[in-house]
Amino acid sequence: MLKRAHYVALHVTLNHNGLSYQRVFSCLTQFPMLRHSSTAAKNNVSMISKFQAPEDKFFPSFSLKSMPKQSSHMSASLLNSLNTSMKKSFSRKKYREAVSLFRKNLWKYEESWIRNQDFIDCCIIACSAYEKLCQPLRIKKTFIILSQLCPKLPAELCRVFLSYATGCVNYGHNVALTCFENSPKELIDYNYWLSWLSFSKSSPVVLWLTFTRISSAGLSPNAETFEILLVAFASQKNFWFFEKTYDLFMQSKLTWRPFTYRVLIESFMKFGNFEEAEKLAYSYVKNKIDSLSSDVFFSAILKFYAVGGDFQGFKKLLSFMTDYNVNFSVSTLNQLLRLNLYHAMDEKISTFSSEHITKLIEQQIKPDLESMLIISEYLNEYKPSPKMRELINWLYSNFHLPKTVSLHFLREVQSLVFRYPLLHSKIHLAISTLKDSGCDWNVGLSYLNWLFVNKRITEAINFFYTITINAGTRPPNELFDVFISNLLKFTSAETTSSAIRKVQSKYPSMCGSSPAIKLILFSKSFSVLQSTSEKIEQLLVSFQRNPSAYSKSFTLALAEWLFSRRLFQSALLYSFKVSDVDDSHFSFRSQILICWCYYRLNDFKSLIQHTNNLLQSNNASLLRRLAATLYRIQIRENNGYKRVLLDRLRKKAILRAFPSRTLNRTEKVKLYNEDAKFRSIFSRVLLHQSHLGNVIS
C-alpha cells in the first residue's frame, strides 16, 4: 500500500505557491466512519452535515442557508482575503486555524465561487491542512460537500481528490469510485484505480472486472496495466488469474520494460516456478535490454539460493553476473550476508561469502536497513562467533540513515526499529518521522509496546494521550486494547481506572455507552488478566456500585474470566444471567460456556439435560457450535459410557443443524435402535451418578 502511495506521489505533481501536495499519502491512519445527512432544495441551497459521534467536535455541524446574493466584486474580495489568511495560517503551521477559516466561510458559498481560482486554492490548502492534522476522512468529507454543492468540479480539484482517493485506503470503494466516475474522462487513469484496488487488497474478481472496464471504455491496456495485475495476483497467490493475465500479456505483444522483467521474475519465484524465473533473468542480461544491468533482477533468485543453502547455484549465478558486468549494489550484499550468517558453520561457504562481502565494501557499497534487519534477526536466534561479531560491528558502524528518504523507507524505520535491539539507537529518528509524516497507528502500536516492555510506563501513558486525546483523534480498538492490557499488567487498579475514565469522557463509544468500565470486553486482555486477578477484583468492587455495569457483554466477559481462573461455580452463575436463547452472539457463547461449566463440575446429568434443551432450538448456528463443543468434550472424556452418550448427542445436534438431510427407511430403523441403546446407556449412567461426584448438589 505504501509503495503504491509513493508511486502516486511521484506521478501527481501539484504545487501552488511553494505548498507541496505530494505528502497527502502519509495519512494512512484508521478513523471511524462519519455519518452525514444532506438536503438540497431546488432554489434554496441547504446542507446539513451532522456527525453522530459525540467526539467529533473538530468539524461541527453547519448548514448552508440561502443568503442575499453579493456582488461579484464583494465575492472576489472575500475569497481573496480568505485565500491570503489561509496561506498565512498554513505557512505558520497553524493548520487548525486554516481549516477553521475554511469552514466558517463555506456556508457563504455561491455558484460563481467554483470558477474562482482563489476558492480552488482555499480548497487545496484546506485538504493539505487536514493531511497535516492526520485526518484523511475530513478530506473525504470536503469532497462530499463540494460534490453536493457543485456536481461538476473543476479539473484541478478533481485531480487533487483523485490523488487523495488513490493514496488513502480509508476512503472505501464507494467514495473512491464516485471520485473516479465524477471526474472528467481525460483525468481518469485506470492504472491508478487498479493500483488502488491492489494495495487495498481487493479480491481478484474485482481487479479482473475493473480490468475489463478498460476495453469497454475504448482504451487499450499498456505494459504498466499488466504489471499491476501480475503483481496483485502474485501477492494474492492466485495462479489462475495470474496465468490468464500472463497469456493476455504475451498475446498483446507489448514492449517489455525492464520493470516488466523484474515483476515476472519475482512473481514466478512466489509461485515456485524457479526455472522460468531464472530463464527470464538470464535472457534479460544476455539481450542487454538495459545497458546498466542492475542486480535487483537476481535478488529473488540469490535469496532462494542463500536460504536453501545451495552454494553451487549461488556461486554459478554470481559468476554469471560478474562475466556480464552486472552492476552490484547493496541487494547482492544483503544476499551474501544472509548466506554468510545462516550457513556460518560451513567453512567453505563462510570463506566465499566473506571474501565477496569485503570486495563489495571496498567498492563503497554500504549496508542499508534490510542489512540491519538480517543481522538483527540472526542475533535474535543465534550467538555469533568472535569473527562474525567483528564483521557485524563493522557493518553496523558503517550503517547511516540518509538525510532524505522516501515515505516507504520512513514507514519501514518506524515499524521495525522498536522490535530489534540493534536498531534502538535510531529511535529518535523514528519518533521524529512519526510526527512529520503523520501518525501511523501500526507504528504507534509498536512504540507503545516497546515503551511498556522497557518499563517506561509514564512515557507510554503520555504518548497514548498525545496521539489520541491531545490530537483530537479517536484511537482504534487494537491500540486501546494494548494500552489497557499493559496498564493492568504494570500499574495499579486506580491508575487503570482513571485512565479508562479519561478516555471514556472524551470518547464514550470506546468503552460503550454505559458509565461502568467494561475492562474485560477485549479478547486480548484475557492472557494478561490471569496474572492480575487482584487488580481486577479491586476494579470490580469499585464498579459494582453502578447497577448499569452488568450489560450482557460485560457479564459474559466476567464469566469467561472466572472460568479461566477455574472458578466454575461462579462462572456458571454469571453465565445464566445472559443465557436467554436468541440469535445474539452473547447467547451462543453463554450456552456453550454453561456446557463447559457442567463438564468441569463433573455434573453429567445437568450437562445432558442442558444439551437436550438446546437441541429443541431451531438455530442452526447454535446447533453447529453445540456439536463442536460436544466433540471437544468427548475427546477429553475417559469414561466409555459418557463418550457414547456425547457422541449420540453430537449426531443429534448435527442432524438438527442440517434438516435437509432426509433419512430413508433403513436409516430410520437404525436410528430407532440407536435411540433404544441410548436410553439404556443413559439409565445406567444415572444409576452410577452418585459415584461421579456432583459438585453442585
UniProtKB/Swiss-Prot annotation:
Record flagged with keyword Mitochondrion: yes
Location in the cell: Mitochondrion
InterPro entries: PPR-containing_protein, TPR-like_helical_dom_sf
Disruption phenotype: Impairs growth on galactose.
GO molecular function, one term: mRNA binding
GO cellular component: mitochondrial matrix; mitochondrion
Tagged with keyword Transferase: no
PPR repeat residue numbers: 257-288, 294-328
GO biological process, one term: mitochondrial gene expression
Function: Mitochondrial RNA-binding protein required for the stability of the cox2 and cox3 mRNAs.
Protein name: Pentatricopeptide repeat-containing protein 1, mitochondrial
